Regions:
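Beta-strand-turn-beta hairpins that frame and shape the catalytic cleft
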Residues: 1-4, 104-111, 192-194
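Conserved beta-strand scaffold positions in the cores of enzyme catalytic domains, especially
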Residues: 3-5, 26, 61, 179, ...
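Short catalytic/ligand-binding loop motif for oxyanion handling, primarily in non-cytosolic enzymes
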Residues: 35-36, 68-73, 112-114, 118-122, ...
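Active-site metal-binding loops of divalent metal-dependent hydrolases
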Residues: 7-9, 30-33, 65-67, 114-116, ...
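Binuclear metal-dependent phosphoesterase catalytic core
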Residues: 185-212
């Protein structure tokens, strides 16, 4: 199947529309909210478009830290404001039903918002066999490594978890596990061994397209 991986949107309606026009399963890695230069209604339209596509089984959606910022105070981050809060609140039922903490396309292919770094993989003895069960167990509890916020991003942990890991300062790839994620802005899709950071829509209008 062809997959279109779409990086952090932050209110860019035109990028959502461009992605949805492509053939293949679209996977959005989160962060639709909290642009500093886009109006609230652009963010609302972004959510409405991806929610509709998800209901039609044309797309899948992963939580970003900027969505969780409005749902879990632990994840509160820059850009938070009351207009965006209302946008999320009005769609909370759909968001909680459709958004995922992560997606394993295969046991060896993980898609998340910010990536799973090798430090967490090693520390908690994760394997390809136990990865999905462990992540499902971690998701409801904000004190688990999935929700860690690293020192580099202003948190109390040595590295960030799947919503906060910084590509430049904290991420190390895991042998045998291909990963796609966003969160750390840069120019173009960046690759480190078998991992890809796709948060590039501020600088380069690129999606990552793969046959899996």
């Amino acid at each position: 199947m062809k997959y279109i991986f779409v990086g952090d949107i932050h209110g860019k309606v035109e990028q959502v529309e461009r992605a949805l026009a492509k053939d293949g399963m679209k996977i959005f890695v989160g962060d639709f909210m909290d642009s500093f230069d886009r109006p609230w209604n652009d963010h609302a339209k972004c959510l409405d478009l991806v929610i509709e596509a998800c209901k039609k089984d044309e797309a899948k959606i992963i939580y970003g830290n900027h969505e969780l910022s409005y749902l879990q105070p632990h994840h509160r981050c820059s850009g938070y404001n009351v207009e965006m809060e209302q946008v999320v609140f009005d769609r909370k039922k759909d968001i909680e039903a459709l958004f995922k903490s992560h997606i394993l396309i295969t046991p060896e292919f993980l898609v998340s918002h910010a990536g799973l770094t090798k430090q967490i993989w090693d520390k908690f003895q994760l394997t390809l066999d136990n990865l999905d069960d462990k992540l499902q167990d971690w998701w409801p509890n904000i004190r688990t490594p999935m929700h860690w916020i690293g020192n580099y991003r202003g948190g109390l942990n040595k590295v960030g978890g799947l919503f906060w890991c910084d590509w430049n300062a904290e991420f190390n790839p895991i042998e045998g596990l291909t990963q796609v994620f966003g969160h750390t802005a840069g120019r173009g899709v960046r690759q480190r061994v078998n991992s890809f950071c796709i948060d590039c829509l501020d600088n380069e209008h690129s999606f990552l397209e793969m046959e899996i």
